[in-house]
Amino acid sequence: VSDDPSNLEFQPRAKGSVMGFPAHEGRPGALGEVHARPHPLIEKPRVLVQLAFMTEGGSGVDHAVLSELSRRLGIAAPDRQARHHAMKWGKGSLRWERHTEFSTYLWEGPLSESGRSHEDTPFGNGFSPPGTVISGIRLEIRKWTPTSERLIAAFDPTSLCYSLVERGNAAIVTDFRQDGDGMTRILVLDRGLTPARTGALSQRLIDIETYRTLAMLGLPLALTLSGRARRIEDRLAQTTLEMKVAETRDSQTLLADLTELAAELEADAASSLYRFGASRAYD
């Protein structure tokens, strides 16, 4: 604002400032993160195929995969520090995102009304996975018609999940089963969603299935530690009983037993800290 308080015309602010005050250096990145994952605009009918890979090899493996895909298209590869990237692929588009311990490759393309997809995903010959697959999703978006309703019969009725969303303008169908390609199938029947709402709904469904699978990575470890915890409890109870009734064992021996139990318990807690923390974050 000009020096004259009666003049309400706003003058250009200094770059990196808020109301004339210096902005924190991390503020642009923090604000930009809100817009890092915009919902795609999706016209129907459409098919989305996403694979999520565990990236134990680090971000360099993803960059090598993206560089090869870019080379095949004759375009520039993304920056090594990039966390997301998009490119045209065939009749659709490919979006990549890097997360803490996994990365996702999402291909979106056309789907004919007859039920046949024109899929030319990058996941065919020549695609080098950056790690092992933890989640695979195939999501089809179709107009809600009597013909498309018949596709519900292809899902397992014993585990069928059917939900009406968006005030009844769309239905979500899945059975959480995997098809012959190992993909979890989701069907969205649409009778009035805008491309923006369709994109937002699709992204949420894909995120739910991806994070559901990642959260369950802690289950095998929890089952293993559950048995170990029971054994530690039994040994602690036995040692405590000996402290009360046995006169033959000296205090140093009992103390050594207790110390060993404490160390074993602490080691198990430390080894599970990251996995359980990740499961809570994914939940």
Language model features with spans:
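Extended alpha-helical interaction modules
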Residues: 97, 107-257
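Membrane-associated alpha-helical segments
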Residues: 253-283
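N-terminal pre-transmembrane cytosolic regions of membrane proteins
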Residues: 1-140
